[in-house]
């Protein structure tokens, strides 16, 4: 028998983002900034998603063409080129994007040289972008 303890939820949103890791957070910000009413949900009490496994680092690329070559090799032609190209181009723009986002709270964004895992063409274009510090942020409070 169905329970009568259901919660009434009648709010409406243009976009519902499921998962509050880097990708979900950025998707929610972009949708909001374009004028959408956004709901961001996550199954965990604290945000971060799988992003916490990367110690807060985002894989970045100095050169989108070199990143494309590397990523195409590593995926063994299982992913369409336009998807691989979009990923490579996004990786080449993530550091300036994060610097812009960090302006709101004075977060310190730092690049760290860290080549890709395998010595294929383009591996040396990769590095990491990290958020080193967020002034007056106490993670223990969350």
Task: Specify the residue positions occupied by each region the protein language model found.
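N-terminal Rossmann-like FAD-binding beta1-loop-alpha1 element of flavoenzymes
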Residues: 13-40
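Fold-independent oxyanion-binding glycine-rich loops
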Residues: 20, 42-44, 55, 62-63
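Conserved redox-cofactor binding core of oxidoreductases
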Residues: 89-142
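Structural recognition of the beta-strand scaffold that forms the well-ordered cores
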Residues: 40-42, 52-53, 59, 95, ...
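Surface-exposed patches in mature extracellular/periplasmic domains of secreted proteins
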Residues: 43, 75-86, 103-114
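A short, basic/flexible loop-to-alpha-helix module at the beginning of a structural domain
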Residues: 1-12
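Glycine-rich active-site loop/strand segments that organize a redox cofactor
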Residues: 58-90
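Glycine-rich FAD pyrophosphate-binding loop
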Residues: 32-54
């Amino acid at each position: 028998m169905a329970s009568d303890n259901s919660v009434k939820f009648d709010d409406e949103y243009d976009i519902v983002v499921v998962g509050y890791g880097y990708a979900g957070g950025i998707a929610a910000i972009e949708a909001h900034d374009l004028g959408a009413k956004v709901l961001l949900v996550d199954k965990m009490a604290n945000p971060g998603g799988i992003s916490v496994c990367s110690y807060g680092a985002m894989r970045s690329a100095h050169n989108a063409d070199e990143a494309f070559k590397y990523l195409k090799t590593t995926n063994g032609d299982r992913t369409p080129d336009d998807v691989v190209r979009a990923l490579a181009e996004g990786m080449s723009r993530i550091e300036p994007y994060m610097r812009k986002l960090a302006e709101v709270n004075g977060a310190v964004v730092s690049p760290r040289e860290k080549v890709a895992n395998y010595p294929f063409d383009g591996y040396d274009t990769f590095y990491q972008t990290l958020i080193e510090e967020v002034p007056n942020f106490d993670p223990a409070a969350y």
